[in-house]
């Protein structure tokens, strides 16, 4: 799976860095004292920009990998509150990913345990697999922007989203069309993440994040094996207004 994931993510990341370089070169260098994360967040600004994301499943989904690309929009809502190292500001944000892919093992036979009439056993059953494409939206991102330094603005966040895929996901036992069974084309994505903005120009920053994402249909399908955990990394470019 990594053979498919790594080249795609490298190409997408290279494209993003090229765009950010063009954006920076289009402006004259600004004095260093104009680049201040704390000054920007003090204005309770809007923030928006593109990002790339990729990662892998863990545990029994370690042979799954993911890539996605999209845009984020957020608004810092409050001034700073709370004491000490947890001092920060509340931000509400959302993300839209028109490109979302998951690479899974190819269709195969898999030993599956079953229970019938009080008896248990196992059998080799056909499983679906391959590449799944879709669209994802994360309309609820609750972010706590921790107190920034001059150039770095860290955060922690909790979020919830939704994925639609072109086939039922994750791959599971193949069932005949029209028959009950299988998973769902709709899945939910509760998640937790950490990250930071690194300010490179006045009101512009590179953005880095790491997210632990759970994928589950909440039993919208007849089966809900889900992806209990995946670790996905994000890189983006952000403008602040």
Label for each model-derived stretch:
Residues 1-40:
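Cleavable N-terminal export/targeting peptides
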Residues 71, 227-241:
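Outer-membrane beta-barrel "beta-signal"
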Residues 25, 36-45, 78-90, 147-153, ...:
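Short loop/turn motifs that connect adjacent beta-strands in outer-membrane beta-barrel proteins
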Residues 46, 50-56, 90-100, 156-162, ...:
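Transmembrane beta-barrel strands of outer-membrane/channel proteins
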Residues 67-170:
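Gram-negative (and chloroplast) outer-membrane scaffold detector with strong preference
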Residues 54, 75-77, 144-146, 196-198, ...:
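Residue-level signature of outer-membrane beta-barrel architecture
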Residues 60-64, 104-111, 167-177, 218-225:
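Outer-membrane beta-barrel translocator domains and adjoining extracellular loop/strand segments
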